[in-house]
Amino acid sequence: MGLLLLVLILTPSLAAYRHPDFPLLEKAQQLLQSTGSPYSTNCWLCTSSSTETPGTAYPASPREWTSIEAELHISYRWDPNLKGLMRPANSLLSMVKQDFPDIRQKPPIFGPIFTNINLMGIAPICVMAKRKNGTNVGTLPSTVCNVTFTVDSNQQTYQTYTHNQFRHQPRFPKPPNITFPQGTLLDKSSRFCQGRPSSCSTRNFWFRPADYNQCLQISNLSSTAEWVLLDQTRNSLFWENKTKGANQSQTPCVQVLAGMTIATSYLGISAVSEFFGTSLTPLFHFHISTCLKTQGAFYICGQSIHQCLPSNWTGTCTIGYVTPDIFIAPGNLSLPIPIYGNSQLPRVRRAIHFIPLLAGLGILAGTGTGIAGITKASLTYSQLSKEIANNIDTMAKALTTMQEQIDSLAAVVLQNRRGLDMLTAAQGGICLALDEKCCFWVNQSGKVQDNIRQLLNQASSLRERATQGWLNWEGTWKWFSWVLPLTGPLVSLLLLLLFGPCLLNLITQFVSSRLQAIKLQTNLSAGRHPRNIQESPF
């Protein structure tokens, strides 16, 4: 298959190797140990350097859809026709923002994190959004989805936003709703969903509507003892164990399904009010995007992997985990494989059978049909996927700081081009002359350099270890070039020390026996009897 190895580790005991520069390999090593795998010791652990297939995606189980937490990111813009109403509109805006649960002002990371990722197995749940002018994030084929929910927007349907601060209550669009294939939901209902989620408090009607509906069982994802339930009012999923009481695991404040449906809305939330004028007056528009708060979980959309879905997204997505392509080979195999593409070494012609890490752990790719519990495979995917998320966060932090540095520099350059302080001293300086806010240089180059230096040090350490370590085959051959001439004398001396005393004893006995025989033969020739020879003083 022409596998090119990026990192190669060989040790008599893999459990003895621990290094912070290899978090993914460390995690793989720990998983092999915890599962009692026969490959937990004395094996080669390899990662692929192929950029075409950086890893493999695995879908989350139905129960994980009810436990993985999402978060919302909000931005807004005022209506261009809004005049003379900024003060009351600002008051309304602050109240509405407080009523949204778990809102994050930190800019999310948009765009695919990985591409050309293949999904292994069948996703239990997929969410499809169809927007004419939406941002396409990728589309999963229907053949890999067990149940597909389609999101419909209600941008033209309004309802009252109840708040005690207003005499005439503002009106907002209704939240988006979802449709599902015929036969997906059974008539069986449960009151298990009522009163949930309870991990946060909010007055926002999109999350805590006044009219609670009973949840309906999703037949394709449920078993006799474990039900996966859908609350169509709040667009939320719940997992109920029928053998236990009602007091079970707490539901996240913002569920994955709720966050995905909200982010599909065109312009998020459009606020209109009656009490500012005689007719409905547009005030401001919300843009809401969603991200997965649970570390290690990603949105899988087609062959693209996302950490966040933008506002007004379109496509077909599921959630799951991403694992790197890590392979195992038994330690008794000779693998003279060049590291980092060293072309000076001879190429190995024979094929080597590599074992995927998950196969070494005794895990097979599961499907999304009828599995409500969290499986051993899901936990493994989650642990490996968390290490990838940590690496992404490190790179994102460095890039974000660099962007802040560029923004700060751009502000100073634009300001300096408008004038010089010495030319506008009579007017109080350039800021007063231009009637603008004063911009100052915010030097964050130290943070940028520290973040980049950390990444470069990790890469440099790995590269140095690959080129100077004892596993470097080129260096090994140079080492043998001066050791080989000394091998012959050293081996000869060792053999002489081991077998020399034995050989000397044998030679002494042989010489002594030959001398006795010669002496006996001489006496017989002289006519003496052996007895006389023995009694003779001579």
Swiss-Prot record:
Site features described as Cleavage, chain residue numbers: 350-351
Signal sequence segment: 1-15
Cytoplasmic side: 500-538
Protein modification: Specific enzymatic cleavages in vivo yield the mature SU and TM proteins. The CXXC motif is highly conserved across a broad range of retroviral envelope proteins. It is thought to participate in the formation of a labile disulfide bond possibly with the CX6CC motif present in the transmembrane protein.
Free-text comment about domains: The CKS-17 immunosuppressive domain is present in many retroviral envelope proteins. As a synthetic peptide, it inhibits immune function in vitro and in vivo.
Family: Belongs to the gamma type-C retroviral envelope protein family. HERV class-I FRD env subfamily.
Official protein name in the record: Syncytin-2
Organism of provenance: Pan troglodytes (Chimpanzee)
Gene that encodes it: ERVFRD-1
